[in-house]
Amino acid sequence: WGAIAACFAVIAVLGVGVFQNGLFGNKTDIATLDNGNEIIFVKSETAGSSIDIDGTITTRQLTETEAASLFPNLTVTAHAVFRVDDTVSDSNKELIGFEGKIENAKVVISTTDIALLDTKIVGSEESSEVNGTSVTAGYFVTDRNSVGEQNVIYYATFKLGDSTVYVENAGAKTESESVKNDLATIIQELINNGALDLSSFNG
């Protein structure tokens, strides 16, 4: 990873009005959690977008101890993402988020008002409640490839304290139930864990 000039794609107004313009169809897919809560995934369309972040971005991989402390009861491999102002030393870098994997699912967490994502979701908003936390979720199906196969991608965004979380799980369309339910379990576990404790996190 190293220090690189930042160019991340973002969700438009991450976590607030993420899905706009009514481009979703009426299709929904529901995951029922073991506590009875439901996550409603609404069929969507997607579009890419990118934005430059002022300053320089540097990253480093979380240690096993850090990952276990930040994400208890989950198997996580992730990098911490820092912004370094060109006018200050690297020792004054600012933590702005995390990017990595929980099990096979992608996770991107913004710990400031800077959104770090490589997907922009366009559609119509519908939120669910998981243990009192609002979750906005959707899914989309890819075009058929040369042999007629399609993939499905389920995703969701929600707040944990001051952090905004985006999670995404993908797989073959024929395995959509497993893809959906695996992501729903991860969402529930993240919400059960509560806000990230960054008080002892070292750059």
Regions found by a protein language model. Name each.
Residues 9, 90, 163-166:
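Amphipathic alpha-helical interaction segments
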Residues 37-160:
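Short, solvent-exposed recognition patches
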Residues 19-24, 70-71, 196-201:
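Short, aromatic- and cysteine-enriched interfacial helices/patches
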Residues 1-47:
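Membrane-interface helical sensory segment of bacterial ECF anti-sigma factor regulators
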Residues 123-203:
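A short, solvent-exposed beta-edge/loop patch
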Residues 4-13, 32, 48, 68-69, ...:
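Intrinsic disorder/low-complexity segments
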Residues 27-30, 36-39, 48, 54, ...:
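Intrinsically disordered, low-complexity regions
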